[in-house]
Regions:
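Single-stranded nucleic acid-binding surfaces, predominantly the OB-fold ssDNA-binding core
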Residues: 2-108
Length: 108
């Protein structure tokens, strides 16, 4: 376990995780009881908290055989295209490490 990964706490119906990043201290809850599976990926509802102050609810941990990422809340625009409420630049690779920490919490 790397020094940035904290111990996870398993509760009745959710799993908590923490990750200390360069920009923020991340924490969150995963809800494996509400997990769904499609042909290509596993979707686990989650909430993500930044620095213990801002909580983003309605996120999803998306897992395929070779990739894990966090899907943020979205809305459908006038042209029926899905748009995210959050802009995450591709250069911000820390969010990938947060997704990996969340995935590891599910496995523990």
């Amino acid at each position: 376990m790397s020094r940035k990964d904290k111990e996870t706490k398993k509760k009745d119906n959710f799993v908590e995780f923490e990750y200390d990043g360069k920009e923020f201290k991340y924490s969150g809850r995963l809800y494996p009881d509400s997990q769904t599976e499609t042909k290509k990926c596993t979707i686990t509802p989650m909430s993500l908290t930044l620095n213990g102050v801002i909580t983003i609810k309605g996120c999803k941990l998306m897992q395929t055989d070779n990739k894990t990422w966090i899907n943020f809340p979205q809305y459908q625009d006038k042209e029926k295209k899905w748009q995210s409420y959050f802009f995450i630049p591709k250069e911000f690779e820390e969010i990938v490490k947060v997704a990996e920490a969340a995935e590891k919490a599910m496995d523990d």
